[in-house]
Amino acid sequence: MDMILILKYIFLIITVFYVLFIFYFKLRYPFWSKQPIFYYHDIGNLIYPKGIIETSLPNCSERVDKSIIFKEASELSLNEIKDMKLLLTNNYMTDSFEKYTPTNNDIIDHLICRTIPSRISFYYDKKKGDLIGTMTSAYKQMIMSKINLNVGYIDYLCVDKNNRGKNIAGQIIQNHYIRERYQTKNSIFLFKHEGFSRPFVPLTIYNTYFYKLDNFEKIILTQQSLNISLITKNNTAMLYDLQTKLQNEIENSTSMFDCIIMDEFQHLTYLIEKKHIFIFALIENMKPKAFYFFRNNYTTYNDAKSIECYSCIKYENDIDTNKLILGFYLAIDYLKTIDKYKILILENIT
């Protein structure tokens, strides 16, 4: 058998395998396979990246369900917020030992006080009128080298447990995406997916670790040159300087990060004021050296309160690693005085 014939058979086998995979993919993911997403098997996009996949406005004539409520978060009534809280409390977490226990303000505060309005979709049972599905989009700034974009971060995607398996989540996502595109002209949205990875090319992949805070012993400082400072409304200038520094470094290609996604300064200070997030600065000789970001996720595990560390950033790149770790332990000590947190959730992302 000559080499040309062998190559033809190899090409034929690869082609058949690829076609069969496409059929499997469309059957396995009937909703996602129709969405403008970068997939691993998108060979053309792998070789010649096109950037934004869908630049033109989507066709809304057949894909918009007007019975799905779509509005700005600031326009929600008190009853709508209460209904949303009830849905999330009963259905947001997947396991029985997990409980999501927010108040009305804990939910809405993450969606307001932003330059670009956050929007929300509500899916109601057509017979009973109960709220059985929801999703929100809130805008964050994505900064990469020579790229600065507003991206819609998708959150609170939740469907009542008794109504799952009916593609309600898919309908909410599609409706929300189309309406958002026509409202803001934004074409980039960010999803956070937990668990088994789907065949989409992710922006990043990271692990999340759980720790018992009782295992962290109290740190006793023996010198005064190094300490931890909680960011409040009186010293938010340090946070502003950090955001400015991060943006300048990545735009000048001198950053340790390839990509930064952050909330605008105005919204961060609002969350600090409402005590939804706690940001600590490691101070040495009156100068910031590192920052530690914690979020109250209003979630308990076996009735134990948890706190989430979602970012740890060096302000000075040459800071000693031992000092960076010491600052983290000092921040943990401070958090224990704020509330009775028992579990630390650490996102290994920065």
Residues of each region from the PLM?
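Short, low-complexity, Lys/Arg-enriched N-terminal segments of secretory-pathway carbohydrate enzymes
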Residues: M1-I4
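Extended, charged low-complexity segments
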Residues: I283, F294-Y315, I325-A331, L346-T350
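An N-terminus-focused feature that recognizes amino-terminal "leader" regions
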Residues: I6-Q223, S229-K245, N252-T269, A290-F293, ...
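Beta-propeller domains
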Residues: K274-A281
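Ligand-binding pocket scaffold of soluble enzyme catalytic domains
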Residues: D318-K323, L335
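Conserved acetyl-CoA binding element of GNAT-fold acetyltransferases
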Residues: L149-K161, N302-I319
